[in-house]
Amino acid sequence: MALGLRCFRLVHPAFCNSLAALTRPVSEVTLQTVRGRQNDHGQCMAYAAVPVRHFATKKAKAKGKGQSQTRMNLNTALVEDIINLEEVDEEMKSVIEALKDNFNKTVNIRTSPGALDNITVVTADGKLPLNQISQISMKSPQLILVNMASFPECTAAAIKAIRESGMNLNPEVEGTLIRVPIPKVTREHREMLVKLAKQNTNKAKDSLRKVRTNAINKVKKSKDKASEDTIRLIEKQISQMADDTVAELDRHLAVKTKELLG
């Protein structure tokens, strides 16, 4: 009996440490030192790490800010074998950056020469930005000049593109020189810019949908690499990332709208 109790006392610490390790997140490496009473030497027990990536669920989003969120645990190694979510995230972020750049260049109360740079002109050689086929300069605070001397054959197409840019511009032509009067800052002009901002935001959302669709299609093609539950979980995560990006696009639109309307 005494021998049995002694053995139990020796085994008990290691047994408890093992149980404690099982209750910890699988993403941690648990290293416990078991103090043996036999020679007072430390013995180490290591548990292998399993990489895990944590994501918030839509249900968690609905709880509101400042509250604890339920997290989805995705095995990083398993997910990366199917799709690189970080690359998908970068593509979605690039959509946001493109919209912000668009707002800064083309959706401003005061029209500047830079606002005309990326107006797309349909030419015989394809679609080209206006600044590649012309010289754009500021004649005065009320007038922008677009010199088409290098590509005179594109003058008519350039005028059409400027007029249809959505920036409320009415170009006038003198030979190969296009004069673009800068519109006065009226309430109507502000509202037209808001409309343009919404159009550009919708285009950004279209680009985002393409990123989401391409990512999900890639996941669907990997059904032989993972279970249906894993595939479905990854698809939900991609959709959630897209939803978060849409919310960010809407936030930038709201800020821009407030700026334009004063």
Curated annotation (Swiss-Prot):
The keyword Acetylation belongs to this UniProt entry's keyword annotation: no
User: Cellular component terms, GO, for this chain's entry?
Assistant: mitochondrion
An example Gene Ontology molecular-function term: ribosomal large subunit binding
Compartments, record wording: Mitochondrion
The UniProt entry lists the main location of this chain as mitochondrion
Q: Does the keyword Protein biosynthesis apply?
A: yes
Give the transit peptide range.
1-55
GO biological-process terms attached to the record? ribosome disassembly; translation
User: Keywords of this protein's UniProt record, alphabetized?
Assistant: Mitochondrion, Protein biosynthesis, Transit peptide
Please report any disulfide bonds recorded for this protein chain, giving both cysteine positions: none
- Family per similarity comment: Belongs to the RRF family.
Annotated function: Responsible for the disassembly of ribosomes from messenger RNA at the termination of mitochondrial protein biosynthesis. Acts in collaboration with GFM2. Promotes mitochondrial ribosome recycling by dissolution of intersubunit contacts.
Q: What is this protein called?
A: Ribosome-recycling factor, mitochondrial
Q: Which gene encodes it?
A: MRRF
